[in-house]
Amino acid sequence: MYLKLLATCVITVILSSCSSASEPKQLQAGAAAANITPSLGSLTIGGFRPIPATHIHDELFARCIVLDDGDTQIAIVVADILGLPKEVCDLAKEQVAQHTNIPASHVLIAATHTHSAATPRGPKGVFWKDEISDYGQFLAQKFSDGIRRAVNNLEPAQIGWGVALEPREVFNRRW
């Protein structure tokens, strides 16, 4: 699903750059990763009941990419988290729009859906609307910071793609 969405965004950037009659513009891309690991004791909710984290096996990241065709910039964030409330994404998009030339409507934020992460919803979990928790505010700031760093890392880029089968990478490991 993320690949289709990324491909759609990339194609949009390419098509918008092809329609210009002026001098050719260079596609630029920038990337950054922001550590979004919560503190020990944060509630992990992937097992459908909150369990406090007692150790960190792997750090959690929000991976950010910015594409710029000279006319339009888009930002994509993929975060290692179970899910993201709209309120957290909206806050991050507001911060991005405030600090960059990227409008909120050009920012895509998605979750990897890991079951080993904390929730930005606070103690009520993901199923009830709640005010943005401290961790949710932390996430929004980290997403915004990651996008700003990706903008600072913009450099000339080319787009390519390929296809390969790797059945050992996609399977249900637990059930």
Please name every model-derived segment:
Residues 4-17:
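Bacterial N-terminal signal peptides
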Residues 23-175:
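Conserved beta-alpha junction segments in alpha/beta enzyme cores
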